[in-house]
UniProtKB/Swiss-Prot annotation:
Localisation: Cell inner membrane
Gene Ontology cellular component terms for the protein in this record: plasma membrane
Membrane-topology descriptor: Multi-pass membrane protein
Subunit structure: Homodimer.
Domain (ABC transporter) ranges: 335-569
Organism: Rhizobium meliloti (strain 1021)
Name of the coding gene: ndvA
ABC transmembrane type-1 domain span: 21-301
Top-level taxon of the source organism: Bacteria
Name the record gives this protein: Beta-(1-->2)glucan export ATP-binding/permease protein NdvA
Length: 585
């Protein structure tokens, strides 16, 4: 994207509140006109003093300019602050909504902290540029536009010096921008690496402590920051050189105005006051050009951040729901996978040609070695991932044709890692159903055998659980997650290793709740503890993304296949059981 395209697109994010922005623009034009009038007035005062005229009215006018300038500046700043802060808040909310709705595969590909970093930096950048533009640079730009014609009206010869000075500034900035374009993009890349490292280490602080990684992680960060600085120094050097060259250009122009102005005064072609006004113009021009250069540097530095953000936005927009997506309603719970295949991006992992059909109300156990694709399969059912091939039908409706929202309303999931948010226990359970009463929340907790430990806590249901529920034990987290699914009361239930962290006694209590919940619901159970899948109507044994065995629990346990071998290995089935069943067959 060219610089122009980047900022044309950036403006689309800012083109709101047109009336308020218009008022700021008008105020800035007035402010700029006063800024130009001041050196002229100053020159007139000097002339009046030297010819011993009355300067009081001009001094009064000058004071009036000062008061008006101050009041207008405060009002413009206040309005600009409000506009820019408001825009930052809305941009963050809008972009957050889109990003958070992206499939998990997108997040794992993009990197959650990377996306977060891009989003926050883009919000800050757009906000900062917008604020400075409205507060300061708009007036600067208008002042520069008014200054040159005013100067030309006074004296063409001295004005040409100002034009050459302006052109020198622009040329120097252009050269520096083209020389540092790649360097600046590299700086952005290094910023991402630094941020990802910091966020990865801090979010895994227990591992960092337990494995004595504090120094090592700090060393690693130092390495990344060094790389960042190595990329950043040459860019900064170029801009420092530009400042030096600008200073030389300003000094030369100032001297030229003085020398030529003196000659013109001596020849009687120009008054002293006019030369003084021109020196004021030159000073104004230098100050404003410096401000514009600083703004141009910011615009240039922000370019890579904004491009990164636009890429993020584009990848998000591509995945929005089609307008004609239907609503999945009145689900009974028949689930069919028809030749489903899915690959993770940049990975050989996924699932291949999975087909099965489960009747409404049945329990389906998905078993198999770790990494076999069990979680991926249930994620596909919820359209966390989109299959590359095949169809998934619920009650005969292809789930690709309905909104994700309606699909997910029909499914309650207990995640492998419980998935608790840093909120109170009550709020975590209520994620199942927002409008549930406290009594309903408590009943769900009771059914999930969670009420005892919750009520033992000082703040009961108001106890805040910490990030990812880290202030609860693994078993407590799972019971809160089960209570949440119970409260949701959806026709399809997914239990992904839902009871793996529970002791035998608690698991037995929770099992009663789950058994009650399973009734009249299609339930998918993923479990390594095979005792929990005994009641399954259908067992799907997966390995390396494929279904290798499928059938009823008794049918598979009596065959001499991998499921039976696994049952024997876990002591659920003895060799004697198998021999008996084979003989009977
Ligand atoms: N986002 C991802 N990108 C690339 N590969 C992935 C991703 N998520 C999972 N995988 C890989 O896909 C395979 C299946 O993962 P999945 O989580 O479905 O296994 P699973 O059978 O549920 O394992 P477990 O019993 O250990 O939970 C694994 O090899 C895993 O490494």
């Amino acid at each position: 994207m060219s610089l122009f395209q980047v900022y044309a697109r950036a403006l689309q994010y800012l083109a709101v509140h047109k009336f308020r922005v218009g008022a700021i623009v008008i105020a800035n034009i007035v402010l700029a006109a006063i800024t130009i009038a001041e050196p002229i007035l100053f020159g007139r005062i000097i002339d009046a003093i030297s010819s011993q005229k009355d300067v009081a009215p001009m001094l009064l006018l000058w004071a009036g300019f000062g008061v008006f300038n101050t009041i207008a500046f405060v009002l413009v700043s206040r309005e600009a602050d409000r506009l820019a802060h408001g825009r930052r808040a809305s941009l963050l909310t809008e972009a957050f909504g889109r990003i958070v709705s992206m499939p998990l595969s997108w997040h794992s590909q993009r990197g959650t902290s990377n996306a977060l970093h891009t989003l926050l930096r883009a919000c800050e950048t757009l906000f900062g540029l917008w604020l400075e533009f409205m507060r300061q640079h708009l007036a600067t730009a208008v002042a520069l536009m008014l200054l040159i014609p005013t100067a030309f009206a006074m004296d063409v010869r001295l004005s040409l010096i100002l034009v050459v000075l302006g052109a020198a500034y622009v040329m120097i900035s252009k050269v520096v921008m083209s020389r540092t374009k790649e360097g600046q993009a590299a700086v952005e890349g290094h910023y991402h690496t630094v941020f990802s490292h910091v966020s990865d280490s801090i979010s895994n602080v227990s591992v960092v402590h337990s494995y004595n990684r504090i120094e090592a992680e700090t060393r690693e960060l130092k390495k990344f920051t060094q790389r960042l600085l190595s990329a950043q120094y040459p860019v900064l050097d170029w801009w420092a050189l530009a400042s030096g060259l600008n200073r030389i250009a300003s000094t030369i122009s100032m001297m030229a105005i003085l020398v030529i102005g003196t000659v013109l005064v001596q020849r009687g072609e120009l008054g002293v006051g006019e030369v003084i006004a021109f020196i004021g113009f030159a000073n104004l021009l230098i100050g404003r050009l410096d401000q514009m250069k600083a703004f141009a540097t910011q615009i240039f530095e922000a370019r890579a951040k904004l491009e990164d953000f636009f890429q993020l936005e584009d990848s998000v927009q591509d995945r929005e729901e089609p307008a004609d997506a239907g609503e999945l309603k009145g689900v009974v719970g028949e689930v069919e996978f028809r030749d489903i295949s899915f690959d993770f991006a940049n990975s050989a992992q996924g699932v291949r040609n999975v087909s099965f059909k489960a009747k409404a109300g049945q329990t389906i156990a998905i078993v198999g070695p770790t990494g076999a694709g069990k979680t991926t399969l249930v994620n596909l059912l919820q359209r966390v991932h989109e299959p590359k091939h095949g169809q998934i039908l619920i009650d005969g409706v292809d789930i690709a044709t309905v909104t994700r929202k309606s699909l997910r309303r029909s499914i309650a999931t207990v995640f492998q890692d419980a998935g608790l948010m840093n909120r109170s226990i009550g709020e975590n359970i209520r994620l199942g159903r927002e409008d549930a009463s406290l009594d309903e929340v408590m009943a769900a907790a009771e059914a999930a055998a969670a009420s005892d430990f919750i009520e033992d806590r000082l703040n009961g249901y108001d106890t805040v659980v910490g990030e990812r529920g880290n202030r609860l034990s693994g078993g407590e987290r799972q019971r809160v997650a089960i209570a949440r699914a119970i409260l949701k009361n959806a026709p399809i239930l997914v239990l992904d290793e839902a009871t793996s962290a529970l002791d035998v006694e608690t698991e037995a209590r929770v099992k009663d709740a789950i058994d009650a919940l399973r009734k009249d619901r299609t339930t998918f159970i993923i479990a390594h503890r095979l005792s929990t899948v005994r009641e399954a109507d259908l067992v799907i044994f997966m390995d390396q993304g494929r279904v290798v065995e499928m059938g009823g629990f008794h049918e598979l346990s009596q065959s001499n296949g991998r499921f039976a071998a696994l049952l024997r290995a876990s002591g659920i089935l003895t060799d004697e059981d198998v021999r008996k069943s084979l003989t009977a067959a």
